[in-house]
């Protein structure tokens, strides 16, 4: 066996087998942390110099070397090696090649345990901010679309059956509220992500007189972890993100399910842009909502990433264990999947065509006005339960003869109650049904306007 040349190889007489080395290496995926690793190292060496743990001259040389590596990384000129295992060892090896053995002083008062934790906090903090910006765009898109369709009437559904007519704008604002809650969850997630593990070292802190508050400020974290064991062992912030991402994807998936239905031949409520549709290799007429289907499908992989990390963490003793190498790929994958899904959804909504006439017509050939009739009868003094029974029988009779409630002659209605007047036919129209549901948060046009006004105030404040 050959001598071990790893940076940690002093304890070992021989090297890893190549296939074992490949199994243990993480550079294929954790290289995404490279810019964050160099940023954290820059803060760490600045602190080492200012606290005289290393000389100012040494700190300057290391910072100059890190700047060279940062420039090379941005230019796509850094090459990483599997023999260096992970991004931390690769950066240190590259730094040594640039400035010599003084690079070894960078790791003073630091372990890969607090190093990787710091990198992941920086990475996720960055990605949470990006994701919230994309959610803001999606929410603005929804509000704009809702405002354009306050008076667009469509069937509201329960059990996928026509229930009551609603404003399409009201339907869109329901999703605005969901994505607003998603934003709030990510904001709270940021609170737990915006902590600095740097300086916790392997698990117990360090004997060097480090200044953790200085590195916290330099990295723009809110505060340092107060317990070194927790600092290197904590992955709650990632699990919290994966949970939030799963809920967010669930909301996107529900919306996509409706979009897929709405653009089908059976509904024809909307027409998706060609930009977000594909065809068939055999059926020339097909226009498939593939992007909506993919968002729906990718929701499962985001759920899987959450379950995977929960399973990794469930039996881990304090502090660091190699199992934690498995915390990154799911996080990276969920960040990328959710981010592109939000972008696609916003652009898909901006470019789709709403077939208002078909939506409206769909409410005229159903019994979604049955509740309006029951409410009307109740307003005339008939107990609601009795009114419900009467309307149910009328619906049954109409279903048998192919007519609708609005087709029943006034004379027949007046046999139920002499108080029923000709205004019943206006009450039974879909637009009137929507307009009259003016309770707080309801689908009434005035209520939808209030929802939109409130949403615009919220968006302006962000």
From Swiss-Prot:
Cellular location(s): Cytoplasm
Pathway participation: Amino-acid biosynthesis; L-arginine biosynthesis; L-arginine from L-ornithine and carbamoyl phosphate: step 3/3
Enzyme class: lyase
Catalytic activity: 2-(N(omega)-L-arginino)succinate = fumarate + L-arginine
Gene3D superfamilies found in the cross-reference section: Fumarase/aspartase (C-terminal domain), Fumarase/aspartase (Central domain), Fumarase/aspartase (N-terminal domain)
Molecular function terms from GO: argininosuccinate lyase activity
Keyword Disulfide bond annotated: no
Keywords recorded for this protein, A-Z: Amino-acid biosynthesis, Arginine biosynthesis, Cytoplasm, Lyase
NCBIfam families found in the cross-reference section: argH (TIGR00838)
PANTHER family in UniProt: ARGININOSUCCINATE LYASE (PTHR43814:SF1)
HAMAP family: Arg_succ_lyase (MF_00006)
Protein name as it appears in the record: Argininosuccinate lyase
Organism: Streptococcus agalactiae serotype Ia (strain ATCC 27591 / A909 / CDC SS700)
Lineage, opening ranks: Bacteria, Bacillati, Bacillota, Bacilli, Lactobacillales
